[in-house]
Amino acid sequence: MAAEPSGRRSRPAAIAKRHPVLIRAVAAVVAGLLLFGSFPPRPWWFLAPIGIALLTLSVRGTGKLRGGFGYGLLAGLGFFLPLLPWTGIYVGPVPWLALSTACAVYIGLFGLMARLLGTLPGWPLWIALAWTTAEWGRSSFPFGGFPWGRLAFGQADGWFLPLAAYGGAPLVGFAVALTGTGLAALVVALRRTVVAPDEVDRATTDAGSGATEGAGSSGSGHSDAAGSESVHGNRRRAVVTAVLVIVVMPVAGLMLRPALPAPDDGDSTITVAAIQGSVPRLGLEFNAQRRAVLDNHARRTEQLADDVDAGRAPQPDLVIWPENSSDIDPLRNTDAAAIITRAARRVGAPILVGAVLVNDDRTTTNSMMVWTEESGPGPRHDKRIIQPFGEYLPMRGFFRLFSDYADRAGYFVPGHGDGTVEVAGIDLGVATCYEVAFDRAFRDSMSAGAELLTVPTNNATFGDSEMTYQQLAMSRVRAVEHGRALVVAATSGVSAIVAADGSIQQQTELFVPAALVADLPLRTSTTLATRLGAAPEWLAIILTAGAVTAVAIRRRTRHRSEPTEQTSSPGLSSHPSA
């Protein structure tokens, strides 16, 4: 009777022992799905640390390094394939599959590093640093990187968000990762304490008996008791330490939330309107009907002017239109220029207009320009971080050999500048659409003195997918990171007014013409994250690189001297090759 429950308890362990690779592979995929589930529009931010914990248990061990890479790659596919299907909505599955796989490779590299660093004392910290390093790599290489899917961008509704004001998106991502690796450490500690204590006790007893054989039963019993007490003490300390690692970052985030600026805190205020004119159709042909997008935004702006005249809306000091809100170049088409000028006159404020400008060499520039009734076009922000394989195609001739999609990519060239425009007497920081994903975009704006931030975007080419909500979450993180109110103006939605604490003050629906008007605070003070810039991230990279190098050298030396010795670390399976 007593042996039956013991057998039931050992059955999962027996399955894991028989099928270690399968168990870890399934766990890795589930970990990736949990990470995906933590991203908007779902508010399940708490799934991210759980996903990191499961991923850590999957990749950690002392088997072959390719195992860590392989399990990490599977987790990456489980994460990015459901996160990024919007990249292939109108161009087919090839770009989606290629991009998801490329991003998953970086999770594989994380798995490789985690397998190396998992043998170090304090391994939860080292593995969390490795995650930060892997995110930096994916956000930088190749072709400028692709930061979409950074852990921080799934935390706009979570406890970790206030940390952005102190270390930016890298600190938020590190905090989530550290909480997850702490959970993994707790599982390992509890496994040693609860699931298999008898195995450790027997090993201690056997070792004590062997060491004291022939010395008498009294001495043997004393040695066994001391050894067992030491083992149990170490287990308890491991559990307590893991719990502390788990709670430190979420508690820090909760404690720092009251320190975030209130939505109306500022040196002065400005009344801003964001116009969402919508588009006549979705997809890559959103602007196929000449001037339709421009007419929609001009019409909605003039409706706002009517509301102002009737006292239904406050008079704006500045009107922000989205990216590509003028679907024809207003510098080359007089009818477009006249429409924008008339809209500025009617609303009584300068308009920040988005347009694709055709250069003399027939390349194009994605621009946001200030337009006034008196002087027409003025200061402008030319998009500096342009999207590879969309706005331009690197190595076009090479990729043309494999797909006719190569001829559908644009011929955009990156702009220059500091990421700000002077309009309505203020310095306005601008990150156009894709740029908001990159740390350096608004860092440059803040260095140039931005008092208010805006993200003009055109999401019509991604239909009604989750992309727009994912991007809005990035804007919320940036608002907290730099302590600035932020305006999102989107052609088809979602447009929003975001406070400096990351809260959404106003938000539109998709594909509905709308105008958001708000009195927004202007600030000149800066957050610690703004002042530190990329320094915390570089510190994490340097520490990770040093630790990985040291462990790799030690591992290589040990394998040379003891080629047949192989051990394992507790995790999902103790099989040494898993």
Regions found by a protein language model. Give the residues of each.
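Membrane-embedded alpha-helical bundles of multi-pass enzymes
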Residues: 2-201, 206, 224, 231-258, ...
